[in-house]
Amino acid sequence: MVQPSLRKDKTPFSNPSTDEIWLPERCLFADAANFYATGLHELVHWSGAKSRLNREMKGKFGSEDYAFEELIAELGSAFLMADLGIVGEVQHESYIASWLKALRNDKRLIFKAASAASKAHRYLMDKI
């Protein structure tokens, strides 16, 4: 089974070129729920690699392509949190403006994102 390589950093992110997830240490989060929510969000990104679910992940912060992948990760992490019984608030205010712009430009985007998030959810739950 392929497993993500976890690295400690102050900023969480998934690095497709090295197939690694960088996640701050637990002590840097307000509570365990936010730590797990962030880790699950990054795992959803990780699941989109060509060798896994092969999602097209492109675009820079603020672009519609980037917003789409972030929406997938946010929905996927919410699905995973629900299945795993993790209750908490996930706050990604920095993405909301780009989500709204992308959603206004494509009325079906939420359904496309939910479908991709559901696939990521199933993929990751099958690995547990």
Residues covered by each model-derived region:
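Long, well-structured alpha-helical subdomains associated
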Residues: 66, 78-128
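Active-site-adjacent structural elements in folded domains
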Residues: 6-9, 58-63, 83-86, 105
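Short pre-active-site segment immediately N-terminal to the catalytic Zn-binding motif
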Residues: 21-38, 63
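Hydrophobic (often cysteine-bearing) scaffold residues that line and stabilize catalytic clefts
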Residues: 32, 36, 69-72, 113
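Alpha-helical transmembrane segments and their helix-helix packing motifs
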Residues: 50-56
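Active-site recognition of the HExxH zinc-binding catalytic motif
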Residues: 37-50, 73
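Catalytic zinc-binding patch centered on the HExxH motif and its immediate surroundings
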Residues: 1-20
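Active-site metal-coordination segments of metallo-dependent hydrolases
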Residues: 59-74
